């Protein structure tokens, strides 16, 4: 059997066939590109000679494929060149389009110009970091004697302090109410130091640099004209961008519901904004911004990489999403670092909710500034309350990486972001229903108890307006506005900031509509300065309902550290609440009234169809004026909208 010739021939013939089945197509293409037939060592001339002797030419089609295969080989060899050519043509076309758009109407093309500058900055930073990064780090490395460097740093700190004192003395001569806000910062910092876990271990470098960065950011946004205009423009672009939510929500719910029902008007914005943030995470833009902000705080304040990344991430994401950035490192973080993570979550708001608050009519510039300024302040005050006394494993940023998510493409990233927001929207809706119902019940119960002892109108808001009035005054709010601001602070602390911002928007709408300031003993609106400071003070998740959210989120990531989280959560909540108050005080120091003065004589002598804040101010000035500078027609215009004793004459 073994010597059977037929079997031997069969085994010889099947062996090369079996090997050829592994990748016949690849062998075929490689052979053609080399100018040979598969499994043949003959040259093309020898093959053609053998074909001429044979009857048919079975491989005549292979010659027809050779030009295409050679073209493919050429493209492979010069792929990088083709990419550069394509990129160059694309950049040339975009540059020409941008140039033409700017020449035709620069204001119309401003958004495109800014986006182009952002992209160029991003690409330029990557290129410079790759080419000059090591050289710049060596150049910027401190040189000289350590003691000399120490005295140099102390001299800079002293100069900065003296400059701040000089600036305050000159600036507050025009607006003395700024001194109250400065005193508020001193009081809140002293209170937090008194509550510190380890008084002797406080890193005053972290505290001073954190408050200094907060001041510089506030100075850039609030006081300087270019910074204010830039953030005002950014807020307007965000408002316009969020208005596109109406297209989707109107299609799903209908025009009538979107126009009149709060849930269908505001909550879809959270879905849209969450979708956009998810896409930005997928392309890496969010990670780049977070890393740059974290790097700035780390090199100045001397904090660790993980805690700094978490606080920087809180500018854009919520208290439960920011810890996901450092999830692999939570198990090994010290208690001080975990305290920073919690404080950062309580001291800021999520980017998706930022869009919802802007839709209420809250000032977008103040919201954006509050979110950015809160990050260094949260890091500083957290290190004041819970200083580092352990050895951290994350002193340097090497080995700490940010993920880009699990999405494989932009469509999946957008879909995932929208799906994740459903839980957030449902949570907000459920909390609003529950908290507003509880608040109404508490007010009814307090009113019932107050009636028994002849106290009329007793409510939760009234109690807060008395208890928290000194806190509102320390922020720099005028005393007549303090009851309303204290009421909003109480709602934010004991219920949530969503309800408080809703109430603040109602006060703002009344002011803009030109409503009378007082109706009986009840104030109908507050000043613009009080609105801005309240916007800063409410910008944070520091309320008692967030304790369960924070503990639940962190415990789900690191179950073995549940006792550590429970140990410091109340301290972090208190610190986060104080961060928002210090943020408001900083805004009070830097706030400056803007806008041109209204010419009341010209305004009141025109035909008025509706009231406004400017008309109310002018009419109040006309009613209180003792000089006959306002014409009877101007007073008649005012009497159409407001009641005054002069109108009865």
From Swiss-Prot:
GO terms for cellular component: apical plasma membrane; brush border membrane; cytosol; nuclear speck; plasma membrane. Keywords: Cell membrane, Disease variant, Glycoprotein, Membrane, Symport, Transmembrane, Transmembrane helix, Transport. PANTHER family: SODIUM/NUCLEOSIDE COTRANSPORTER, SODIUM_NUCLEOSIDE COTRANSPORTER 1. Expressed in kidney. Glycans are attached at residues 605, 643. It catalyses: uridine(out) + Na(+)(out) = uridine(in) + Na(+)(in); thymidine(out) + Na(+)(out) = thymidine(in) + Na(+)(in); cytidine(out) + Na(+)(out) = cytidine(in) + Na(+)(in); adenosine(out) + Na(+)(out) = adenosine(in) + Na(+)(in). It comes from Homo sapiens (Human). Sodium and pyrimidine nucleoside symporter of the plasma membrane that imports uridine, thymidine and cytidine into cells by coupling their transport to the transmembrane sodium electrochemical gradient. Also transports adenosine, an atypical substrate transported with high apparent affinity, but low maximum velocity. Therefore, exhibits the transport characteristics of the nucleoside transport system cit or N2 subtype (N2/cit). Involved in renal nucleoside (re)absorption. Belongs to the concentrative nucleoside transporter (CNT) (TC 2.A.41) family. N-glycosylated. N-glycosylation is required for localization to the plasma membrane and the transporter activity. It is a multi-pass membrane protein. It is found in: Cell membrane; Apical cell membrane. This is Sodium/nucleoside cotransporter 1.
């Amino acid at each position: 059997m073994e010597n059977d010739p037929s079997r031997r021939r069969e085994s010889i013939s099947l062996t090369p066939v079996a090997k050829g089945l592994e990748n016949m197509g690849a062998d075929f293409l490689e052979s053609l590109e080399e100018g040979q037939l598969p499994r043949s060592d003959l040259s093309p001339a020898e093959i053609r000679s053998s074909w001429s002797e044979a009857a048919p030419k079975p491989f005549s089609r292979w010659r027809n494929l050779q030009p295409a295969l050679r073209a493919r080989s050429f493209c492979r060899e010069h792929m990088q060149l083709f990419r550069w050519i394509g990129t160059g043509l694309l950049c040339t076309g975009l540059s020409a389009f941008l140039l033409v758009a700017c020449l035709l109407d620069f204001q119309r093309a401003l958004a495109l110009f800014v986006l182009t500058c952002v992209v160029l900055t991003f690409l330029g930073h990557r290129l410079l970091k790759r080419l000059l990064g090591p050289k710049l780090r060596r150049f910027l490395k401190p040189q000289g004697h350590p003691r000399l460097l120490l005295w140099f740093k102390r001299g800079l700190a002293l100069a900065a302090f003296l400059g701040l004192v000089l600036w305050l003395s000159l600036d507050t001569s025009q607006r003395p109410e700024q001194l109250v806000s400065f005193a508020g910062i001193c009081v809140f910092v002293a209170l937090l130091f008194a509550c510190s876990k380890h008084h002797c271990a406080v890193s005053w470098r972290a505290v001073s640099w954190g408050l200094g960065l907060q001041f510089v950011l506030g100075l850039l946004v609030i006081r300087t004209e270019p910074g204010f205009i830039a953030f005002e423009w950014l807020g307007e672009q965000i408002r316009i961008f969020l208005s596109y939510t109406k297209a989707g929500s109107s299609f799903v719910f209908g025009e009538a519901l979107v126009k009149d029902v709060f849930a269908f008007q505001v909550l879809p914005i959270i879905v849209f904004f969450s979708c956009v943030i998810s896409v930005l995470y997928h392309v890496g833009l969010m990670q780049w911004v977070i890393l740059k902000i974290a790097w700035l705080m780390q090199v100045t304040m001397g904090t660790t990489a993980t805690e700094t990344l978490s606080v920087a991430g809180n500018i854009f994401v919520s208290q439960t999403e920011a810890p996901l950035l450092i999830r692999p490192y939570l198990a090994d973080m010290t208690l001080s670092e975990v305290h920073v993570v919690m404080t950062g979550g309580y001291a800021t708001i999520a980017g998706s909710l930022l869009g919802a608050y802007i839709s209420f009519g809250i000032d977008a510039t103040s919201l954006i500034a509050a979110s950015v300024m809160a990050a260094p302040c949260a890091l500083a005050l957290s290190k004041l309350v819970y200083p580092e006394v352990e050895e951290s494993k994350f002193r340097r940023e090497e080995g700490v990486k940010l993920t880009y998510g699990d999405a494989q493409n932009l469509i999946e990233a957008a879909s995932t972001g929208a799906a994740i927001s459903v839980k957030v929207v449902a949570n907000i809706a459920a909390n609003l229903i529950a908290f507003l119902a509880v608040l109404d019940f508490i007010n009814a119960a307090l009113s019932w108890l107050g009636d028994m002892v002849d106290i009329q109108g007793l409510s939760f808001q009234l109690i807060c307006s008395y208890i928290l009035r000194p806190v509102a005054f320390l922020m720099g709010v005028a005393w007549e506005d303090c009851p309303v601001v204290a009421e909003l602070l109480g709602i934010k602390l004991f219920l949530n900031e969503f309800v408080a911002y809703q109430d603040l928007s109602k006060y703002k709408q009344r002011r803009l509509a030109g409503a009378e300031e007082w109706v009986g003993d009840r104030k109908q609106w507050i000043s613009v300065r009080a609105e801005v400071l309240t916007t800063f003070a409410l910008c944070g998740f520091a309320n008692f309902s967030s304790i369960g959210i924070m503990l639940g989120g962190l415990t789900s990531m690191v179950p073995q550290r549940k006792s550590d989280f429970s140990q410091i959560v109340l301290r972090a909540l208190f610190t986060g609440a104080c961060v928002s108050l210090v943020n408001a005080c900083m805004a009070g120091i830097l706030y400056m009234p803007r806008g041109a003065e209204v010419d009341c004589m010209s305004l009141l002598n025109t035909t008025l169809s509706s009231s406004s804040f400017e008309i109310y101010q002018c009419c109040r000035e006309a009613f209180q004026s003792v000089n006959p500078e306002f014409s009877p027609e101007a007073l008649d215009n005012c009497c159409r909208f407001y009641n005054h004793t002069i109108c009865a004459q």
